Amino acid sequence: MKTNCEFPLLCLLIVLVANVEGEVEDTGLKMVKRLWRNWEDPEQRQLLDQETELEKQREKRLWRNWEDLELRQLLNEFAENQREKRLWRNWERRQVANEDDGEKAKELWRNWEDLKRRQVADLNDEQETQRDKRLWRNWEDNHATLRKRSADSLSRQKRLGKERGKE
């Protein structure tokens, strides 16, 4: 009886049951023993643990980047609201002081609107710059992770190939 099994405990159970029934070939038993050794291999376990830890660190880093971005946006909104209030109070004071001078009030209003538009444009530019930086960092992190995984996979394949060659 030959079997190809991904789960070592299940393979062991199949071999034990088949052995009781007298149907086990030596090659099947060797295959199950080899699978079991690979499963218990500390190097293999360590590689899996390292990959898991790298993935956790990457998720934490992405989460911190997102939280930092959210905080910056909230602070920018707060600062923008404070500037608006200050500009509005200034405009009201000037409006009261210059009630008789309608042209000056209109000019102040236009200046205030222009300032508001420039502030919104500057804020949008800053947010876009921050977004581009964050996307670039994420791309670099992902690229580095993929290179590391590829190198780990190649070294693992070479090592497994050598082990299989010895058997």
Swiss-Prot record:
Keywords: Cleavage on pair of basic residues, Pyrrolidone carboxylic acid, Repeat, Secreted, Signal, Toxin. The keyword Repeat applies. The modification Pyrrolidone carboxylic acid is found at residues 95, 119. It comes from the Eukaryota. Residues 1-22 form the signal peptide. It is found in: Secreted. Residues 147-167 are annotated as: Disordered. GO terms for molecular function: toxin activity. Its main location: secreted. RLWRNWE repeats lie at residues 34-40, 61-67, 86-92, 107-113, 134-140. One of its GO terms (cellular component) is extracellular region. Expressed by the venom gland. Residues 23-94, 112-118, 139-167 form a propeptide. Belongs to the scoloptoxin-08 family. This is U-scoloptoxin(08)-Er5b. It comes from Ethmostigmus rubripes.
